Amino acid sequence: GCKKDRKPCSYHADCCNCCLSGICAPSTNWILPGCSTSTFT
């Protein structure tokens, strides 16, 4: 899944976005738009 490279999501727009709920969704996901791009921890 996402974050297998363990780098901040903001570095990989083509990988995933980190939602506040802790869900890591694909940046191309139109179901969960507007997710934050902060570091996923």
From Swiss-Prot:
Compartments (UniProt record): Secreted
Record keywords: Disulfide bond, Hydroxylation, Ion channel impairing toxin, Neurotoxin, Secreted, Toxin, Voltage-gated sodium channel impairing toxin
Modified residues (4-hydroxyproline): 8, 26
One GO cellular component term noted in the UniProt record for this chain: extracellular region
SS bonds (residue pairs): 2-16, 9-19, 15-24, 18-35
General function of this protein: Iota-conotoxins bind to voltage-gated sodium channels (Nav) and act as agonists by shifting the voltage-dependence of activation to more hyperpolarized levels. Both natural (L-Thr form) and synthetic (D-Thr form) peptides cause paralysis and death following intracranial injection and grooming and hypersensitivity upon intraperitoneal injection into mice. The L-Thr form of the peptide is 7-fold more potent than the D-Thr form. Both natural peptide (L-Thr form) and synthetic peptide (D-Thr form) are active on nerve, and on muscle.
Record remark: domains: The cysteine framework is XI (C-C-CC-CC-C-C).
Protein name: Iota-conotoxin-like r11d
